């Protein structure tokens, strides 16, 4: 449950504990600590923090594919790696992408490609991993409330992770 973007795990571990608390209390009160009785924790975790972490994990390997010129362009124009994004990621485990921010990002990326300051191949990587991250997050947001549905969910998750690389 460590944060995919920093490796830190104390705060996110406490977040997981908060997700576990309702299911654990209910199970203890009922005297039933079976897998089924505690399943609510899995549902709460994977539909919340887990979905955000899955999206982040899908995007991380792409950063190793960027060359120095493209990475510097992203930093210089504060497209991806800026202080506000890092602060938001630390607090909410994701970066909100409103229409204004998205338009600015697209404009700078396209300008970078057209002006030769940013590679089209890197833009393709960004688009690919963003799409995969979105698919994974959506899948995790639909984590099954019923343990019997887990094998089917898990098979689809494995397929999506396979596509993500």
Q: Where are the regions a protein language model picked out?
A:
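C-terminal auxiliary extensions adjacent to catalytic cores
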Residues: 64-165
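Short, low-complexity, polar/charged sequence segments that are solvent-exposed and flexible
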Residues: 11-14, 60
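Glycine-rich phosphate/pyrophosphate-binding beta-alpha loops
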Residues: 1-11
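Active-site-proximal substrate-binding core of FAD-dependent oxidoreductases
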Residues: 6, 19-74
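C-terminal catalytic subdomain
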Residues: 13-15, 21, 87
């Amino acid at each position: 449950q460590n944060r995919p973007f920093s490796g830190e795990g104390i705060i996110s571990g406490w977040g997981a504990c908060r997700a576990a608390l309702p299911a654990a209390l209910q199970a203890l009160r009922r005297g039933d600590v079976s897998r089924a009785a505690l399943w609510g924790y899995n549902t709460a975790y994977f539909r919340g923090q887990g979905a955000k972490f899955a999206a982040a994990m899908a995007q991380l390997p792409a950063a190793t594919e960027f060359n120095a010129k493209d990475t510097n362009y992203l930093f210089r124009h504060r497209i991806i790696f800026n202080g506000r994004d890092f602060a938001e990621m630390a607090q909410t485990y994701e970066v909100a992408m409103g229409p204004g921010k998205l338009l600015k990002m697209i404009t700078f990326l396209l300008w970078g490609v057209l002006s030769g300051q940013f590679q089209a191949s890197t833009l393709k990587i960004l688009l690919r991993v963003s799409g995969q991250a979105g698919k994974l997050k959506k899948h995790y947001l639909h984590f099954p409330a019923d343990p019997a549905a887990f094998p089917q969910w898990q098979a689809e998750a494995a397929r999506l992770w396979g596509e993500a690389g």
